[in-house]
A protein has these predicted regions:
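Substrate-binding pocket helix/loop in short-chain dehydrogenase/reductase
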Residues: 93-94, 101-104
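C-terminal helical subdomain
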Residues: 175, 196-233
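Conserved NAD(P)H cofactor-binding loop of Rossmann-fold oxidoreductase domains
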Residues: 85-90
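Conserved glycine-rich cofactor-binding loop
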Residues: 10-11
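Conserved glycine-rich Rossmann-like NAD(P)H-binding loop of the short-chain dehydrogenase/reductase
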Residues: 24-42
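Residue(s) in the substrate-gating loop at a strand-loop-helix junction
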Residues: 135
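Active-site helix of classical SDR
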Residues: 117, 151
Length: 251
């Protein structure tokens, strides 16, 4: 059985990945993992000619991650696509962020994709792909989103390392670096209307971002940064000392 796995699939970018995954990969089933079962069922019903399996799970919970991993190890599917999309981000001064929110960001943004990817790799054949959703926040430190940008820098490093490590096996790894999108992420994280930087940035289209990431991953590419302005920022962050970048990246 050939499958794809998408986390954070209930809305936004994850939903777009789910809607387009079958166009780029030969899949028998798509496994959807997210907290909201009703939203995933609605998504599955919008694709009546496709087979979707729903895993209601909160990736902040290690037991939920283990449930998904157990399904992989029990059924031993051929995993053609893994999209580590689920993520959390909160905006505030570092000492004001609730401890539980910091823990949640670390668990969802780092622990979950690390453990899920490690479990999936043994079942990925040549030609399979892993997509990690990072962020433009990975390019330079973001004051007032210190933990979030650190988790995304971790994902950037993990994706680059695994791309090199898995290349001999023919498994491609791509990191996607989107800028802010008009999704629930901005409201859930208390970002919308509270950040002079985010409020001024152009918005990334989730549909186009997912399509480009899937297409580039299928072609063996290693990264995608939507929008020309964000590509320039990525270059700027590479060549400019971060103490000069941070006044621009401060959220």
């Amino acid at each position: 059985m050939k499958i794809g796995i998408i986390t954070g699939a209930s809305s936004g970018l994850g939903r777009e990945f789910a809607l387009q995954a079958f166009e780029y990969y030969d899949l028998d089933e798509l496994w959807l993992a997210a907290r909201r079962e009703d939203a995933m069922r609605a998504l599955a019903e919008s694709m009546p000619d496709k087979v979707c399996r729903i895993f209601p799970c909160d990736l902040r919970d290690l037991a939920a991650i283990d449930t998904l991993i157990a399904a992989i190890e029990t059924e031993k599917p051929e995993i053609r696509l893994l999209v580590n999309n689920a993520g959390l981000g909160y905006l505030d001064d570092f000492e004001k962020v609730d401890r539980d929110k910091d823990i949640a960001m670390c668990d969802v943004n780092m622990r979950a994709p690390t453990l899920l990817t490690a479990a999936a790799i043994p079942y990925m054949p040549r030609g399979a792909a892993i997509i990690f959703v990072s962020s433009i926040a990975a390019f330079a430190p973001n004051p007032r989103m210190s933990v979030y940008c650190s988790t995304k820098a971790y994902i950037q490093s993990l994706a680059k390392s695994l791309r090199y490590e898995l290349a001999p096996r023919g498994v491609n790894v791509l990191a996607l670096y989107p800028c802010p999108m008009n999704t629930e992420f901005l409201t859930v994280g208390g970002i919308e209307g509270r950040s002079r930087t985010f409020d001024k940035l152009p918005r990334c289209d989730p549909h186009k971002a997912a399509r480009a990431a899937l297409a580039r991953a299928a072609k063996g590419k290693g990264s995608h940064t939507p929008l020309l302005l964000m590509k320039f920022y990525r270059f700027l962050a590479k060549v400019t000392p971060h103490n000069l970048i941070m006044p621009l990246s401060k959220t």
